[in-house]
Structure formats: structure tokens, C-alpha cells
Amino acid sequence: MRFLLFFLSLGLFSAGQAAMARPWLYVSTFAYAGTGEECLDNAADALREEGFTRDFEVKRFKGKSRNAGGHVDGKLRNYPVVAKIECDQSLGVTGLAVTGIDNELTYEKYSVLYDKSW
């Protein structure tokens, strides 16, 4: 009887596959004519206003292109959602990426940031 219970429990718990959690990713790029510093400052404000304050970082490009931009990224305090805004004055573009496990929350945060200006 003990072996039967063992094999029954083994069959119940090993038959299914592990749950696969796949993140959602939303990305956009925009033309940008301002300076790299303006973009970084405004991007930092936009992310903070939307709650991306955990592991918050502003990183400027190194070397001669330091004033040409960099990136700002952060995570929501209590949810697994990450946002990143990159500013590149030399290319005249800025990029936005938001990723997370919860599609509704990820898209909501992406939409709000998409509508902001930095």
C-alpha cells in the first residue's frame, strides 16, 4: 500500500509541466531634438512620477559622447515591472521600453510613459 501511495503521488506531481512565466515587453522610439542632458533629466522625472523608484539609475554615456545622453531605468517598488528610457542625441532619438510579468500593469505603465514628454 505504501508503494502504491508513493507511485500515485509521483504520478500526480510529475505529470504536469512547470508553469512558464513569460514577460511582456513594449518598446517605442521617438525622434528627439533636445540635448542629452535635458532628455535624461526629464526621463528621470517621468520614471519617478510613475513609481519606478526601486534600483533607480541614471547612467550617462562615457567619453566624448557623455553629454550626448545615456539611459535611465528603474523598477516599480512592489511589482515586477521595469522601465528604461534611453537618450541618444547623436542619433536624434530616444527609446522607451517597459517589461513585466503582468500584462495589464505593464501595458498601463507603458501607455502612461508613452504619452509623457521627456
Predicted regions and their residues:
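A cross-family detector of function-defining hotspots
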Residues: E50-R77
